[in-house]
Structure formats: C-alpha cells, structure tokens
C-alpha cells in the first residue's frame, strides 16, 4: 500500500437533490410521481448510503485513515495514496479528472440501477478488495487518458469528449486537421474517445470498440451534413500513439464537453483544440 491515507469521494443521490433539498419542490414531485416511482427513488437513496456506510465501516475495521469528500467541488488529491469513489461512473470520472498518479477504486453503490463500468467494487466485495490493497496484492488496470489542449490550457479526459455547438439543435461548424489534411465540416459535432470510452457514445455514432488498454484514440464526426459540395474524407478513424488531431472552431457558441456534461469548455470562433494521448494514465484497482 503506497499510502495509508484514503480519500472517500461520494455523490449525493437524486432523492437528496429532488426531495430533501426543498419542501415545496418535494411536495410537488410527490404529487406528480406514481407511488412505485417514488419508492424507486427512495430505495436507490437508501441503498447508496448503506453502501457508503459499509465502505466506511470496512475502512475503520482495518484501521485505515480516510477523509470524506462530496463530489461537486474542486479537490486536491495530493497526500492520498488511494481514492475510493462511491456512486457510479459519473462519480468515478469526476474524481479521475483530478488524479495524478494516485490509485482509484470505484464502488458502484447501486449495481441494479447505476452504470458502473469503471467500478470494480460493490457493497458485497469491497472488504475483499480493500484487504488485497492493504496487502499489496491488488490487480491494477492501467487505463490510457487523453490530453485536451484548448487555447493553451490542458485538461485530462478518461472517457471521451464532444465538440459541438452549445445548442443540440444547431449545426456544428469546424475545421479538422489530421495527418496533413484539413477539412471544413458541418455536422452535429465530433466525438473523440479513448479506448476506455470506445464502448460509449462514439460506438453509437459508428465508431469502433477498442481493446481496454489500447494506446490509440479515435474520432468520429456525427451526422455529417451532406449538402452540395460536401464530399468529406475525414469521417472518423484511429489516432495512433504519438499523433494528434486539431479542431478549429467556426462557431460563435461552440463548446467542448469533457467526460460528460459537467465540464464544459468554451470553444468560440477561432479557438483551437488539440487532442493527443496523455502521458499520465489512470491506475484503477480492479477485480
């Protein structure tokens, strides 16, 4: 175990936000929802916090020092050897953005409902995963990340990014630069993903599923506009290790979404985006 100090990074539930945050809104929602739907929100809430309590109990029983942190605000992971996330993939991805060399263990607090593809842990197997971590026998999955550079500012991404107009109903206009080719395009946006993200949105857009530990990235424009004179060549493909792809915004209100919707970077007319493989992969504790 590289460090005995653990950061416990957890989410609040939909029940917290919609039913416990304000009495007036809670009363309105309870009138609108069917009893079985309301029960599902409550059951999910209770299961999440039961899992969180179980994780804390296991940490205390093994004498592990830890600090709790609720997602939604910036945090400093330095000084922690392990970050444990309790929630689903959204919680995992939010924590992962800040990590630089730390190990991360995802615990899916509701495997029946929550997507937890990056989460090796559950309420049932967490104690065993923790025991192996303490003994130095954990299986570590090294996942490649990509580096995003927008206007000379750099950001990491584990899953994928979407370059598009800020309105989903508006056309996205941009210029792609890849392997010596430059092409202006009109579409619904461009997906760029890592291997870890290749089973998600980019797959639905027509991309390929890559081996989990592949060092390649891939890009895929979505819903290219096929009007007059729009014979496109850069319709998607792999970005090899050592290569990069650049996109220049031709939109007044363009954006770059990083690993979901929580991180949204302005991408106004003339802005340049450069994407390549990051030299800082993520160390994930696995089953």
Give the role of each language-model region.
Residues 91-96, 198-203:
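Short glycine/serine/threonine-rich phosphate/pyrophosphate-binding segments
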Residues 85-86, 106, 192-193:
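Redox-cofactor binding/interface segments in oxidoreductases and associated redox assembly factors
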Residues 96-110:
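A short, gly/pro- and small-residue-rich
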